[in-house]
């Protein structure tokens, strides 16, 4: 097995963060509604907290090359992640925060009679998705422009919603989860891939990692229950939630 070199990964995450690397845990101070609080922002956060977790900055279009880096499968075993998604050939999947479509177009190969909604809010990423769809002559992926609070999907339309290193960046996690809940069919599922916050050896900034305990609190508060947890990926949790 090749030894994975994390230095490029660490450098990129650091470059996207604020220059102040002395990050402190900042307690939220001003209470708002629906589980949100406001407080002083840390180096990588927006100063908005959900159920005690500070929300991180969003990776912008500047991160496109990193999302498509040649070493990504070696570092994260993305092929194994796609292989383990609970899919049928006719499944309807929503890739929330699809970015460049790295996962979207790989998943599309597993659902030739299904549909994949590639949901994005950033115009630059949406342009890249359309370019890639045309380049690949793809007939499965449908590109959807979402908002910060909703994926803009039809109610009861989707079997599986996927978020890959996206959930911790959602500015409105409560609203997004509730919108996804409506979009999922009865028995629908969410899969979250998130960098493991419990593991200090994972070379990612703290706000870009999450713990299972924290994710469970947030998902359960919005109508989901954890049905499968696995750590077969090198640095990410693989968590499957079902509608209650």
Predicted regions and their residues:
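Conserved class I S-adenosyl-L-methionine
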Residues: 89-99
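Conserved SAM/SAH-binding beta-strand->alpha-helix loop
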Residues: 122-123
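Conserved SAM-binding strand-loop segment of SAM-dependent methyltransferases
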Residues: 136-148
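Class I SAM-dependent transferase core
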Residues: 25-86, 92
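Core SAM-dependent methyltransferase catalytic element
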Residues: 222, 227-244
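A short acidic, Gly/Pro-enriched loop at the edge of an enzyme's catalytic core
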Residues: 151-160
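Conserved SAM-binding loop of SAM-dependent methyltransferases across substrates and taxa
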Residues: 100-112
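A short glycine-rich, Lys/Arg-flanked "PGG" loop and its adjoining helix->strand segment in the class I
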Residues: 174-189
């Amino acid at each position: 097995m090749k030894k994975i070199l994390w230095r490029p990964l660490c450098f990129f995450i650091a470059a996207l963060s604020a220059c102040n690397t002395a990050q402190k845990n900042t307690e939220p101070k001003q209470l708002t509604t629906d589980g949100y609080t406001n407080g002083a922002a840390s180096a990588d956060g927006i100063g908005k907290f959900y159920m005690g977790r500070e929300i991180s900055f969003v990776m912008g279009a500047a991160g496109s090359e990193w999302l498509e880096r040649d070493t990504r499968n070696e570092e994260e075993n993305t092929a194994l992640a796609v292989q383990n998604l609970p899919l049928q050939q006719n499944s309807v999947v929503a890739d929330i925060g699809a970015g460049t479509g790295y996962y979207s177009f790989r998943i599309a190969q597993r659902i030739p009679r299904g549909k994949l909604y590639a949901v994005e809010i950033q115009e630059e990423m949406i342009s890249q998705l359309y370019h890639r769809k045309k380049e690949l002559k793809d007939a499965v992926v449908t590109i959807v422009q979402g908002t910060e609070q909703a994926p803009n999907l039809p109610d009861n339309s989707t079997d599986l919603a996927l978020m890959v290193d996206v959930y911790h960046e959602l500015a409105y996690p409560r609203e997004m989860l509730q919108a996804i809940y409506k979009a999922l069919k009865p028995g629908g599922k969410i899969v979250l891939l998130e960098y493991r916050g419990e593991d200090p050896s994972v070379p990612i900034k703290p706000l870009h990692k999450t713990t299972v305990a924290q994710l469970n609190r947030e998902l359960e508060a919005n109508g989901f229950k954890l049905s499968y947890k696995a750590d077969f990926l090198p640095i990410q949790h693989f968590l499957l939630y079902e509608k209650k």
